[in-house]
């Protein structure tokens, strides 16, 4: 007799294999796509006195990433100029950030966000943690390849020179993208062993055996770890998130918390990040933009439903209240609708 959790886990696995991720994206390929026509319309919009931002937003937020690459190619053929640099000159502020982000491939976007998080003085640990903890093996391997292509250095090298201690070890291990893939066989003995090892390495003893935590949480498959965290509760008086808060501090604590939340429910993790970026006074636009751009073709529909379920109001509604102008329009198109 399978438990509900196993059935859900199996469904989510099968779902992930049989349903392309884009099925949960809010941005789909445009049906009557014509790259030449789009390139011409964007060229006209850029040349318009005062710049016709509405046309630029309408076109680029309603095309798939692949289609945007075709538009950029057609634009360069037409004008002998790069679309990205033409738009950089024509736009400004948060809208510019969104539009330039949409022109990059997903791996280029992640690579450039990672580079920016480690450039200059200080590290933007939040961005580094979010990307490294939430991307799949395949995505991470592609990011590593593109990062080297773009910056002529290894992502791992940059992480090593920009971080330290156990936090560095965790980031380096995750960035390799070598986690076991979800299999169809459930190994109950290993689930139990891992749960006990996590408990023995942390809450049960004085001090924390961080390398043990790192090896289990970066090497096992997502589905396996979901079961491990469930099982963990039968050994520990605290769940995994509470244990992390008790055992480690600083960037390491932050990274483990992000990682466990991503493993437990990735769309909910992003829904929480989006909520945090807009709650209270002011908006953390950097976080908001990065998620809206990077998840729009991956799992935005799932993120929206988790957001509505947890916060009682739609993501669309929150964005409407928190942003304005063509920047708002661009984000709402990426959101893909109200719930």
UniProtKB/Swiss-Prot annotation:
Cross-linked residues, Glycyl lysine isopeptide (Lys-Gly) (interchain with G-Cter in SUMO1): 49
Gene Ontology biological process: positive regulation by host of viral process; positive regulation of receptor-mediated endocytosis involved in cholesterol transport; positive regulation of viral life cycle
Positions of modified residues (N6-acetyllysine): 49, 152, 227
Predominant cellular place of this UniProt entry's protein: secreted
Keyword annotations from UniProtKB, A to Z: Acetylation, Annexin, Basement membrane, Calcium, Calcium/phospholipid-binding, Extracellular matrix, Isopeptide bond, Phosphoprotein, Repeat, Secreted, Ubl conjugation
Changes after translation: ISGylated.
Subcellular location: Secreted, Extracellular space, Extracellular matrix, Basement membrane; Melanosome
Positions annotated as Annexin repeat: 33-104, 105-176, 189-261, 265-336
Classification via Gene3D superfamilies: Annexin
Residue positions where Phosphoserine is found in the record: 26, 184
Induction: (Microbial infection) Up-regulated following infection by classical swine fever virus (CSFV). Up-regulated by the presence of CSFV envelope glycoprotein E2 alone.
Chain spans, region S100A10-binding site: 2-24
Function text: Calcium-regulated membrane-binding protein whose affinity for calcium is greatly enhanced by anionic phospholipids. It binds two calcium ions with high affinity. May be involved in heat-stress response. Inhibits PCSK9-enhanced LDLR degradation, probably reduces PCSK9 protein levels via a translational mechanism but also competes with LDLR for binding with PCSK9. Binds to endosomes damaged by phagocytosis of particulate wear debris and participates in endosomal membrane stabilization, thereby limiting NLRP3 inflammasome activation.
Binding partners and assembly: Heterotetramer containing 2 light chains of S100A10/p11 and 2 heavy chains of ANXA2/p36. Interacts with ATP1B1. Interacts with DYSF. Interacts with COCH. Interacts (via repeat Annexin 1) with PCSK9 (via the C-terminal domain); the interaction inhibits the degradation of LDLR. Interacts with CEACAM1 (via the cytoplasmic domain); this interaction is regulated by phosphorylation of CEACAM1. Interacts with APPL2 and APPL1; targets APPL2 to endosomes and acting in parallel to RAB5A. Interacts with S100A4. May interact with UBAP2.
Entry comment, domain topic: A pair of annexin repeats may form one binding site for calcium and phospholipid.
The protein, known as: Annexin A2
Annotated source species: Sus scrofa (Pig)
Underlying gene: ANXA2
